[in-house]
């Protein structure tokens, strides 16, 4: 299930994005400040280039690039 980013509380969205950008393997040696990485993800969400996917089975949220979202969820 896709969750519209603009329907999340601001603090919840920020924590979700911060969790994503600080996970092992997501920085690739990039020394970009946390605030900049968070802003980039917010912009990707606003432009429809990224989406929040909630998995009912695991009860977990994921941030995915548009090309990684199952096609049937985008229709």
Curated annotation (Swiss-Prot):
It comes from the Bacteria. Coiled coil: none annotated. It holds the Pfam family UPF0270. InterPro entries: UPF0270, YehU-like_sf. Belongs to the UPF0270 family. This is UPF0270 protein PP_1747. It comes from Pseudomonas putida (strain ATCC 47054 / DSM 6125 / CFBP 8728 / NCIMB 11950 / KT2440).
